[in-house]
């Protein structure tokens, strides 16, 4: 059985969203698919908790790419209930496009802290068209889980043309030709020497990060 909680008000829907809602209403047969509204009474909330704990998978399609700020009720409480069920090991949570409570552009989260009852924590996020910045920027990245991109027929080159401020996520394949594997008979003088001038004895963090980065990138001596 599938429980579908419809949290919005139909009068607030766009024409397209209203058509999808009517299709869903036609599919709901009260046996295998049951449509429900947002919990109101204590009994409703208790029933939601029981249904979450009895479910194998929870699909989060509450909010999408337009979220910013903080979650409002009843979404904030519903997200908290889903997170509690997931923390108990009862369910696998899959987010649609973006986990609820995560800004798709910046990775900012509801209430500004992933440790508070703000955003939803997904085990997996299926995002559409292209990867969103908020899925790879923290703290939003901590909410996304495993990320899958489904193009749903959107041509990648066209999306890049339409994007006013495109971004590119560096892949291992991008640096494969730059960072060349070492030869078995190479030595520390074979791959160049790097001198680092940075930091101070009281603030050595920048020097450490630069040195680690140079060594990991293949420098022979740092």
What are these regions (language model features)?
Residues 1-161:
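Glycine-rich phosphate/dinucleotide-binding loop and adjoining beta-alpha-beta core of small-molecule
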Residues 1-18, 124, 135-222:
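Small-residue (G/A/S/T)-rich helix-start motifs and N-terminal tracts that mark the onset
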């Amino acid at each position: 059985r599938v429980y579908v909680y419809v949290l919005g008000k139909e009068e607030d829907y766009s024409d397209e969203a209203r058509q999808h809602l009517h299709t869903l209403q036609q599919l709901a047969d009260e046996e295998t698919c049951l449509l429900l509204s947002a919990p109101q009474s204590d009994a409703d909330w208790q029933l939601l908790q029981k249904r979450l704990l009895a479910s194998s998978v929870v699909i989060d399609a509450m909010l999408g790419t337009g979220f910013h700020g903080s979650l409002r009720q009843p979404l904030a409480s519903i997200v908290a209930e889903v997170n509690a069920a997931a923390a108990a090991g009862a369910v696998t949570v899959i987010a649609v496009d973006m986990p609820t409570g995560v800004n798709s552009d910046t990775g900012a989260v509801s209430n500004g802290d992933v440790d508070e009852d703000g955003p939803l924590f997904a085990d997996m996020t299926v995002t559409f068209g292209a990867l969103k910045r908020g899925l790879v920027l923290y703290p939003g990245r901590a909410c996304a889980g495993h990320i899958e991109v489904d193009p749903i027929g959107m041509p990648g080159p066209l999306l890049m043309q339409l994007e006013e401020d495109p971004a590119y996520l560096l892949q291992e394949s991008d640096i494969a030709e730059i960072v060349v594997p070492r030869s078995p008979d190479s030595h520390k003088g074979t791959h160049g020497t790097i001198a680092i001038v940075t930091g101070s004895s009281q603030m050595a963090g920048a020097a450490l990060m630069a040195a680690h980065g140079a060594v990991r990138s293949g420098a022979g001596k740092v």
